[in-house]
Amino acid sequence: MSTDRACMLCGLVQSTAEFNRNGCPNCQSIFEEAGVSAVECTSPSFEGLVGMCKPSRSWVARWMSIDSYIPGMYAVKIDGRLPIEVTELLPHYKPRDGSQVD
C-alpha cells in the first residue's frame, strides 16, 4: 500500500511523512493562513503522474497551472475537496478532481 498523497491545491505528490514533516512546499503559507494542516489538504486518492524538472519551461506545467511551483511529481487528477477555510481564501480556485471544466 502506498503512503503517497497529493496536495489537493497544487497536485504535488509526496509521502505522508514528508507532508507531516514539512508541509507542502508550494502551498504551506496558504494552509497556515487558513489554519489547517497540510495533511488535511492532501488526498491518498489520485490519478496520473507528471514529472516536472523545469516547470517554468514546460507547456504541460502551464496546461496544469503548475508552472510556478517547485520541480517534482504532480498528480493529474486528485479525489477530495479542500477545507472551506482554504477555498474561501482563493477566489479563482479550480478543483483538481475533474469537477470543473474550463
Swiss-Prot record:
UniProt superkingdom: Eukaryota
Main localisation: nucleus
GO cellular component terms, A-Z: chromosome, centromeric region; DSIF complex
Classification via CDD domains: Spt4
Stretches annotated zinc finger (C4-type): 7-27
Disulfides per UniProt: none
Record flagged with keyword Transmembrane: no
Leader sequence segment: none
GO MF annotation, one: RNA polymerase II complex binding
Localization terms from the record: Nucleus; Chromosome, Centromere
Function summary: The SPT4-SPT5 complex mediates both activation and inhibition of transcription elongation, and plays a role in pre-mRNA processing. This complex seems to be important for the stability of the RNA polymerase II elongation machinery on the chromatin template but not for the inherent ability of this machinery to translocate down the gene.
Protein name, as recorded: Transcription elongation factor SPT4
Organism for this UniProt entry: Kluyveromyces lactis (strain ATCC 8585 / CBS 2359 / DSM 70799 / NBRC 1267 / NRRL Y-1140 / WM37) (Yeast)
